[in-house]
């Protein structure tokens, strides 16, 4: 879902660096650091926090603390860069979401219309993928066959603390693997790993 943030030029336009890319890929713990990095993406893109459509976590004060606030901030930054509507960025027919689907279908070697639509807890469109398809996507990410995938891989490994959080599995595994393993937990108990350079 972070690919359009890079391919559109939105990430380079705001010079967000590896920290900005890492937070755009995160399922984080909602710390002050995470919220600050997500806010920074919005601020650099001249966007208001009120545009975020991810929920406010129970007991928290801001949508910036939601685990994928960085993804939503990157969605908005991309939409701003491409002059796409901001208020409807989570609609399945929004150009951003169509581009996300196109890129995923491309990596899977499928026509986009064969992808099965679903919706994430955060409100964002997502896809019902088979385990083998998830494995293939992470193999592409670890193999870094495309420039944008290499940027994402590098950013996650450079800032594992932003991808998840202190004491969390993804962060600790990426630290202890010394740049050899990418790790990202997802909803419903899914855990995806990829060996850097091999997939």
Language model region names:
Residues 139-182:
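Conserved active-site loop region of the serine DD-peptidase/beta-lactamase
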Residues 125-148, 152-153, 157, 190-199:
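Active-site-proximal alpha-helical segments within enzyme catalytic domains
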Residues 3, 40, 154:
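Surface-exposed charge patches
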Residues 119-120, 166-199:
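Short, Gly/Ser/Thr-enriched beta-strand-loop segments that form substrate-interacting elements
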Residues 15-114, 118-124, 137-140:
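Active-site-adjacent helix/loop patches that line small-molecule binding or acyl-intermediate pockets
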Residues 1-11:
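Active-site SXXK
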């Amino acid at each position: 879902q972070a690919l359009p943030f890079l391919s559109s030029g939105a990430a380079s336009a705001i010079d967000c660096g590896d920290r900005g890319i890492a937070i755009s890929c995160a399922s984080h713990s909602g710390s002050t650091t995470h919220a600050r990095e997500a806010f920074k993406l919005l601020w650099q893109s001249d966007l208001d926090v009120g545009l975020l459509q991810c929920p406010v976590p129970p007991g928290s004060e801001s949508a910036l603390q939601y685990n994928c606030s960085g993804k939503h901030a990157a969605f908005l930054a991309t939409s701003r860069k491409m002059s796409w509507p901001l208020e409807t960025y989570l609609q399945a027919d929004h150009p951003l979401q169509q581009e996300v689907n196109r890129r995923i279908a491309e990596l899977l070697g499928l026509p986009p219309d064969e992808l099965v639509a679903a919706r994430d807890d955060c409100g964002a469109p997502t896809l019902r993928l088979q385990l083998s398809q998830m494995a293939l996507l992470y193999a592409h990410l670890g193999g870094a066959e495309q420039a944008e995938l290499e940027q994402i891989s590098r950013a996650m490994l450079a800032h594992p603390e932003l991808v998840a959080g202190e004491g969390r599995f993804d962060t600790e595994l990426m630290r202890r693997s010394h740049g050899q393993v990418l790790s990202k937990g997802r909803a419903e108990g899914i855990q995806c790993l990829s060996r850097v350079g091999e997939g």
